[in-house]
């Protein structure tokens, strides 16, 4: 066999020639096979490397996707935890199918020892109106009230005859269980209430709103919602004195599920705040207002076309689209053309009764109505032991505006309660309302101070 060796230059070796020469001579394996084997090894290595790169890239994608999913889950959890008050079922009542043809009845409580002229206007007694509202109930009665003192057993015996209406109403509420009617109560009373305890034993659900922790204030709302169809709203709380010795005013509205549903949403907000010591960051859609000052409900009241909406306070208790009490009061005053009549407990436009900082929001609007628009203003204010002395200064300041002004009219009267033999007061003017030639504001605003 002929041996052929291929040498390279003297300075080095040709690796290919060297391999070929010895492979041919030592093993007899074809050179092409060796080259193919090496190429296959190179290809396998490159394929493995490419697959490894793809695998690492896929793993990175999975990690990124997993991280995004985790972030989304945490975000959803935070949102759902922030929406802490969800509202309740609305029995299928919507803005589209609710009733707007409503009947309204004024109810009031006049203390027994107060007499009026024979030709004076009288309205349905408050106690009779509330009894009638309970007679309409078929499924659920929802009550928001700051106080629960319907039974006067803790007071002096001289009050017992006057408190019979309160005891009768408490008995009617206890009887709802036998009729299969659910009673739900939201109260601002943080301490123990024997009456609420009794009602709880009669199957009532009672929720407390800790307003001190939430706003450092008090719950003042007082209203009933019956079957999401009828409701009461006014100045009276669930206190036997509101049915006997105080001057109260409110309205009963029947077959008005549009407004009742909106008021039910206000109740739902209070109901969901039990045990809460913080204001939720987000409100559920079920708590959003259906109507407000810019888009009021167009309805019929006693066959008369009208507009209506509910307002609320404070601002932190306002879900989307809900108007504030201050906005509602301002709108009523600003839209008055001829007269403004106001009945309220206290008129004290101060930010604080101790710091004596002037609060001009409402007082300024009344002054504008008097001077700029020549609107006639009448004020009926309670005068009792808790009346702040500066109240008289502010009223005198308003009256002084009209001393040298033509067509400027302001009248102010103080409603004085009578002192009983035991030192208690009877006949306190507890009304809170405002009526003009164009609108009515009826609410539970305690006094016009901040």
Question: Residue ranges of each PLM-predicted region?
Answer:
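Charged, low-complexity intrinsically disordered terminal segments
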Residues: 2-450
């Amino acid at each position: 066999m002929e041996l052929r060796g291929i040498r390279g230059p003297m300075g080095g070796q040709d690796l290919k020639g060297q391999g070929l020469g010895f492979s041919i001579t030592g093993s007899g394996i074809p050179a092409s096979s060796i080259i193919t084997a090496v190429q296959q090894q190179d290809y396998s290595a490159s394929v493995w490397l490419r697959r490894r790169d793809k695998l690492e890239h896929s793993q990175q994608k999975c990690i990124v996707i997993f991280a995004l999913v985790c972030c989304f889950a945490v975000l959803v959890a935070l949102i759902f935890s922030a929406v802490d008050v969800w509202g309740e079922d609305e029995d299928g009542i919507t803005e589209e199918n609710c009733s707007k043809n409503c009947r309204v009845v004024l109810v009031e409580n006049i203390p027994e020892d107060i007499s009026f002229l024979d030709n004076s206007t009288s309205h349905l007694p408050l106690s009779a109106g509330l009894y009638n509202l309970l007679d309409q109930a078929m499924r659920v009665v929802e009550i928001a009230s700051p106080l629960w003192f319907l039974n006067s057993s803790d007071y002096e015996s001289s009050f017992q005859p006057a408190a019979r209406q309160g005891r009768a109403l408490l008995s009617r509420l206890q009887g709802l269980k036998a009729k299969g009617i659910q009673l739900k109560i939201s109260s601002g009373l943080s301490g123990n209430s024997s009456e609420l305890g009794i009602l709880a034993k009669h199957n009532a659900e009672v929720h407390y709103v800790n307003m001190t922790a939430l706003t450092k204030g008090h719950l003042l709302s007082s209203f009933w919602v019956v079957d999401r169809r009828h409701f009461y709203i006014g100045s009276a709380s669930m206190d036997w004195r509101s049915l006997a010795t105080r001057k109260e005013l409110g309205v009963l509205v029947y077959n008005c599920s549009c407004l009742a549903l909106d008021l039910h949403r206000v109740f739902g907000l209070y109901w969901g705040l039990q045990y809460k010591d913080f204001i939720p960051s987000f409100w559920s859609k079920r708590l959003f207002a259906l109507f407000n000052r810019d888009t009021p409900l167009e309805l019929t009241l006693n066959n008369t076309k009208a507009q209506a909406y509910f307002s609320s306070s404070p601002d932190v208790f306002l879900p989307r689209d809900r108007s504030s009490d201050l906005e509602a009061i301002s709108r009523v005053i600003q839209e008055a053309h001829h007269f403004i009549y106001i009945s309220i407990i206290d008129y004290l436009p101060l930010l604080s009764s101790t710091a004596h900082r002037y609060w001009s929001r409402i007082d300024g609007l009344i002054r504008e109505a008097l001077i700029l628009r020549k609107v006639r203003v009448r004020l009926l204010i309670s005068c009792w032991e808790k009346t702040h002395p500066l109240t008289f200064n502010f009223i005198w300041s308003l009256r002084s505006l009209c001393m040298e002004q033509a067509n400027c009219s302001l009248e102010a009267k103080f409603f004085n309660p009578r002192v009983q033999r035991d030192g208690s007061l009877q006949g306190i003017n507890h009304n809170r309302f405002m009526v003009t030639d164009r609108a009515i504001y009826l609410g539970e605003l305690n006094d016009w101070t901040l």
